[in-house]
Regions:
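N- or domain-start disorder-to-order transition segments that initiate the globular core
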Residues: 1-43
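Generic N-terminal targeting/processing segments that precede catalytic cores or assembly contacts
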Residues: 28-46, 61-74, 82
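Acidic (Asp/Glu)-rich catalytic clusters
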Residues: 40-43, 70-77, 125-130, 213, ...
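Conserved phosphate/anionic-ligand binding catalytic regions in large, soluble enzymes, centered on
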Residues: 48-61, 323
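Conserved, mostly hydrophobic/aromatic
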Residues: 52, 261, 327
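Short acidic, Gly/Ser-rich segments with clustered Asp/Glu that frequently serve as metal-coordination loops
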Residues: 54-57, 256, 264-270
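Active-site-facing alpha/beta catalytic cores
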Residues: 66, 79-244, 265-270, 274-281, ...
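Internal helix-turn-beta structural module
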Residues: 304-342
Length: 342
C-alpha cells in the first residue's frame, strides 16, 4: 500500500472519557434534540436555522460568533431554533486546500489528526457547555461521527458524499436529523434514494463491528443548487423546485417529508450576499403554498463575524478562509427579518 501507518488513534470511547459531557450538558442537548425532532415530525411549526461559518477554522473567533448568535437566538426562540454550524471537516473538490480543523487544528500548520480530534471535540463541547447550543457538523467521514455523537443535534451529508453507501447506512443508524444534499450534478433522484436508504434499517460494517441500524425517520433533503457539465451554476430553491420536491416525497411515501434549503453554494453561485434574497424568496414560497410551508423546515446559511473571505494565511479575525460568508451585522438583521416573516 502506498501509505504510511503513522500512529494508532484513540477510539471514540477513550476520547469521550478524557473529555466527558457533564449531566447538565447532556440534559441541554436532549432538550434541544426533542425540540428539533418535533419540527421534523410536524408537531412544532418553528423554523430551523443551521447557521455559521463555512468552516470552523479557529476556536476563539468561532466561539465569539456563537456567543453573539446565542443572544439573537434567545430573542427569536418562539419562532426559530438556531443550530450553530460548526463544520470541522471540509470536502475538497480536487483534494487540495484546507481540509478543516480535524486535519489542521492550526490552519497554517501541518496536518495533525490526533490534535484535530481533540480540538473539534473541545470546540463542540464549548458551544454546548458555555452557550447551551448543541451544534451541526458535516459527516465527511462516517467512522468519525462517534467522536462527536454526544454533542451534535444535526448532521449533514454533502453533495460529494450523498451517493456513498457508507454515508447512507451510517445515517440510518443516527438518532438525530441527517440532511442529505442533492449531488453536485443536481439529480434529485440520487438525493431521494439516499433519503430513502437512510430511512430504512440495515446490517453493515461500522468501525470494525457488524451492526444493525433501525432506520432514521428524521433523514431529509437539502437543496443546495448544482452545476452543469460546462460549469454553470443552477439554483434549485425556487417555488417550482420546492413544489417538485413535494411531489417526489408524495410518490416516495416516506415518513416526515422535509427539506432544508442551503442558501449558499450553487444556489447563490457562492455570491454570499445573495443568501439574504434567497432566504426571503424561500419564505415567500412558504407563504404562497401550505404544502411548501409544511415541507420546508428551515434554512442553512453561511455567516461569520466579517463579510467575505480571505486566503488560508489571512489575518482578518473572524473572516472565512474557505467560501465567503455573510458578516455579523447582515446576519443579525437577516435572522430578525426571517422571524418577522414567519
Amino acid at each position: 500500500m502506498n501509505m504510511k501507518f503513522y500512529r494508532k488513534l484513540p477510539i471514540p470511547q477513550e476520547v469521550k472519557a478524557e473529555y466527558p459531557v457533564t449531566p447538565e450538558m447532556a440534559a441541554v442537548k436532549e432538550a434541544r434534540d426533542r425540540e428539533i425532532r418535533s419540527i421534523f415530525t410536524g408537531e412544532s411549526n418553528r423554523f430551523i436555522l443551521v447557521i455559521g461559518p463555512c468552516s470552523a477554522d479557529k476556536s476563539e473567533s468561532v466561539l465569539e460568533y456563537i456567543g453573539r448568535l446565542k443572544r439573537v437566538a434567545d430573542q427569536v426562540q418562539d419562532k426559530i431554533i438556531v443550530i450553530p454550524r460548526i463544520y470541522t471537516n471540509k470536502p475538497r473538490t480536487t483534494g487540495d486546500g484546507y481540509k478543516g480543523m480535524l486535519h489542521q487544528p492550526d490552519p497554517n500548520g501541518h496536518p495533525d489528526m490526533l490534535r484535530g480530534i481533540v480540538a473539534i471535540r473541545q470546540l463542540h463541547m464549548s458551544a454546548l457547555r458555555d452557550y447551551g447550543m448543541s451544534s451541526a457538523d458535516e459527516m465527511l467521514y462516517p467512522d468519525n461521527h462517534r467522536y462527536l455523537s454526544d454533542l451534535l443535534s444535526y448532521v449533514a451529508v454533502g453533495a460529494r458524499s450523498v451517493e456513498n453507501q457508507q454515508h447512507r447506512l451510517t445515517a440510518s443508524g443516527l438518532d438525530i436529523p441527517v440532511g442529505l444534499k442533492n449531488p453536485t450534478g443536481g439529480d434529485l433522484s440520487v438525493m431521494m434514494n439516499a433519503v430513502t436508504a437512510a430511512h430504512h434499517p440495515h446490517t453493515f460494517i461500522y468501525r470494525g463491528w457488524e451492526v444493525e441500524s433501525t432506520g432514521n425517520p428524521l433523514a431529509h433533503a437539502i437543496l443546495r443548487g448544482y452545476q452543469t457539465t460546462d460549469g454553470k451554476t443552477v439554483s434549485n430553491y425556487h417555488y417550482e423546485d420546492l413544489l417538485h420536491l413535494h411531489e417526489l416525497y408524495a410518490k416516495s411515501g416516506l415518513e416526515n417529508p422535509a427539506v432544508i434549503v442551503d442558501t449558499n453554494h450553487a444556489n447563490s453561485g457562492k455570491k454570499y450576499e445573495e443568501q439574504i434574497r434567497i432566504a426571503h424568496d424561500v419564505l415567500h414560497s412558504m407563504r404562497q403554498n401550505p404544502d411548501i410551508r409544511r415541507l420546508c423546515k428551515g434554512l442553512m446559511i453561511e455567516s461569520y463575524l466579517i463579510d467575505g473571505n480571505q486566503k488560508t494565511d489571512g489575518d482578518v479575525y473572524g473572516q472565512s478562509i474557505t467560501d465567503p460568508c455573510l458578516g455579523w451585522e447582515k446576519t443579525e438583521r437577516l435572522i430578525f427579518e426571517i422571524a418577522d416573516r414567519l
